[in-house]
């Protein structure tokens, strides 16, 4: 949790848990304080004239006298928690990752069930995704229909990606498997030259399509989409699929209306086989929401961060309160 002014506070993930042994010292101090109070009470009872004692003793509630000491012990406990080094989950922008944006440009993308058409909506949402993706991520772009073409190799230059998105052209047929294999090759190539760690950079494929694979017709073919998805899983590259459109989509081909309903099932299967997630969108607003969700997943990583500062600040405040109450109640600091 995070408290205003104090910052993140956690009671888990302690890096120096042996500091909790200091609690025994705090308990020892508390026991010593109790013993001192008992001894003090006994000394007071030695006065023969109790009426005289009551007349000269400060007229303050006895129970309030112990508040400063209690606050002091509480401050020591808070300092103990801080020294034990609690941690919490912190989301930070990735500065070493590869994302391949793979977009279907087959003729079915002419369908106007999504205004103004599927392609134009895809371009607008993809450009927004590219613009909002964290700067350190290398983003590449592949367009595919009957063949797959790397339009932009993975780069942090978002202008190149947006410019290429504006120039997408329609083409015949749909080779989803080839597009995935092409993306994997691009990821492997850039992963070999990106430094910053012993392991290859984390990678993700974002596959955008609206229809079934037509080359080959069997997705389990050696060059099919399912085979490519299994290969992606073996290489540790999950595929996030976005199926875009409605079941009412159609295009005009040679003067005839050809239905092009969105194919959610194939995309879900590709995501499942690769270890990724599947999404579907039927409007531009839904598509932008999907991309926003992906941006949060892809653009950030969760690490363990220090959460001791909040406990330290709280301990200082309680310690200051102990000193203040000691001066107000007992007219001296607690002993």
Curated annotation (Swiss-Prot):
Q: What is the lineage of its organism?
A: Bacteria, Bacillati, Actinomycetota, Actinomycetes, Mycobacteriales
* Pfam families given in the database record: VWA_2
Family membership: Belongs to the UPF0353 family.
Record-annotated membrane-spanning stretches: 18-38, 67-87, 133-153, 309-329
Q: How does it sit in the membrane?
A: Multi-pass membrane protein
- Asked if the keyword Cell membrane belongs to this entry, the reply reads yes
Keyword Membrane listed? The answer is yes
Q: What is this protein called?
A: UPF0353 protein ML1808
Q: Which CDD domains match?
A: vWFA (cd00198)
- Domain named VWFA: residues: 98-294
């Amino acid at each position: 949790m995070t408290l205003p002014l104090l910052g993140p506070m956690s009671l888990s993930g302690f890096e120096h848990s042996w500091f909790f042994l200091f609690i025994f010292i705090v308990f020892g101090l508390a026991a010593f304080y109790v013993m001192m109070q008992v001894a003090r009470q006994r000394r007071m009872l030695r006065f023969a004239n109790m009426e005289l004692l009551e007349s000269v003793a400060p007229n303050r509630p006895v129970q309030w006298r112990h508040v400063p000491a209690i606050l002091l012990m509480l401050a020591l406990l808070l300092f103990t928690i801080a020294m034990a080094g609690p941690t919490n989950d912190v989301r930070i922008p990735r500065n070493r990752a590869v994302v391949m944006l793979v977009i279907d440009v087959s003729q079915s993308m002419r369908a106007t069930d999504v205004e103004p058409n599927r392609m134009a909506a895809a371009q607008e949402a993809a450009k927004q995704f590219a613009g909002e993706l964290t700067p350190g991520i290398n983003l590449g772009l592949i367009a595919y229909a009957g063949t797959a073409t790397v339009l932009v190799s993975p780069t942090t230059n978002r202008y190149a990606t947006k410019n290429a998105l504006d120039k997408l052209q329609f083409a015949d047929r749909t080779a989803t498997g080839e597009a995935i294999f092409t993306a994997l090759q691009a990821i492997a190539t850039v992963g070999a030259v990106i430094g910053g760690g012993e392991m290859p950079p984390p990678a993700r494929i974002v596959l955008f399509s609206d229809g079934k694979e037509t080359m080959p017709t069997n997705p389990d073919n050696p060059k099919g989409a399912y085979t490519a998805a299994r290969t992606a899983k073996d290489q540790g590259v999950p595929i996030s699929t976005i199926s875009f459109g409605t079941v009412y989509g159609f295009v005009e081909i040679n003067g005839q209306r050809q239905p092009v309903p969105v194919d959610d099932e194939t995309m879900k299967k590709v995501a499942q086989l690769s270890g990724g997630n599947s999404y579907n969108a039927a409007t531009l607003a839904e598509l932008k929401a999907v991309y926003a969700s992906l941006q949060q997943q892809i653009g950030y990583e969760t690490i363990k961060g220090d959460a001791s500062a909040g406990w330290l600040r709280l301990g200082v405040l309680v310690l200051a309160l102990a000193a203040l109450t000691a001066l107000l109640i007992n007219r001296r600091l607690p002993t």
